[in-house]
Amino acid sequence: MENQINVGIIGAGAMGLLYAANFADKSKLTLFTHRKEQADLLNQKGISLIDNETTKNIHIHAAQITEEEQLTKQQLLIIAVKQYSLNEIIPILQKLPTKIPILFIQNGAGHLERLSELGTTRTILLGISEHGAGREDDTTVIWRGHGRTKYSIFQGELNDDLKELLTSSPAFPIEKHANYQAIIQEKLFINAVINPLTAVLGVQNGKLLENQEWHRLLIRVVNEVETVLPIENALEKVETICRTTALNFSSMALDCMNERMTEIDGIVLPILEKGDKTETSLPTLRTLYQIIKGLEGERHV
């Protein structure tokens, strides 16, 4: 395809690798990594995308995040790092030309309070990913669950080429929504229930429905979160995700198992703070938060 758009993806974890693999054929793609060794490996080997029983190798161009000249060439940047890595990424984005639109696809809502640091003249898109993915190594990603990417314009506007690029394809559906708060709140709600429960229990998502006591606990957390973050058919939506991703471990469960820092402050803390403002008690959710923060403290992550 001629005149392909320069798309940069920042972050080469599970989501970054998955999005790079899917954008590689419809854009001139650069995947920006934290470590030079990973960029070198990706340039040599490409991305191995494992989907069910098939493995596909996709050749891509990778560069280290410190290569500012490469960043300034991009016509769209997709930010695929975890919430806690934004402290490192925001200062880099601040230096870039304001004409480059930025799409955030973080879990949680912690990143929303950072957007003002990018000014008011830049086009900013807020998105969520329904895909499940797991990174096996620096160049291999397993596509654990197919879903959609939903995005909304927070500020600014997109040109026609970018609108076309962000149009749905059957293999990798993308949907534009009018209200960014609605799509982020729904994903935040689901993550705030499933992630901490599976992380504390160390189980796959489906176990929250199979085990009667854990299912009661799930219902209790749903009822608590609903008091400060109401969404339609909340329990049904949470249970549907547990069912469709039954064999998957949530990202937070995997982080705890691998003794990594979690996104608990980006996912659960905003809900607890909302509860504090309205003097609403969220005892079960707060307990889950304290357990996970305590585990992080024990591991010094």
Curated annotation (Swiss-Prot):
The keyword NADP applies. Substrate binds at residues 107, 191, 195, 205, 251. Gene3D superfamilies: N-(1-d-carboxylethyl)-l-norvaline Dehydrogenase, domain 2, NAD(P)-binding Rossmann-like Domain. NADP(+) binds at residues 11-16, 107, 133, 263. The active site is at 187 (proton donor). GO terms for biological process: pantothenate biosynthetic process. It comes from the Bacteria. It is found in: Cytoplasm. It catalyses: (R)-pantoate + NADP(+) = 2-dehydropantoate + NADPH + H(+). Its main location: cytoplasm. Its EC number is 1.1.1.169. Keywords: Cytoplasm, NADP, Oxidoreductase, Pantothenate biosynthesis. Signal peptide: none annotated. Pathway: Cofactor biosynthesis; (R)-pantothenate biosynthesis; (R)-pantoate from 3-methyl-2-oxobutanoate: step 2/2. One of its GO terms (cellular component) is cytoplasm. It is an enzyme of class 1 (oxidoreductase). GO terms for molecular function: 2-dehydropantoate 2-reductase activity; NADP binding. Pfam families: ApbA, ApbA_C. Catalyzes the NADPH-dependent reduction of ketopantoate into pantoic acid. Belongs to the ketopantoate reductase family. This is 2-dehydropantoate 2-reductase.
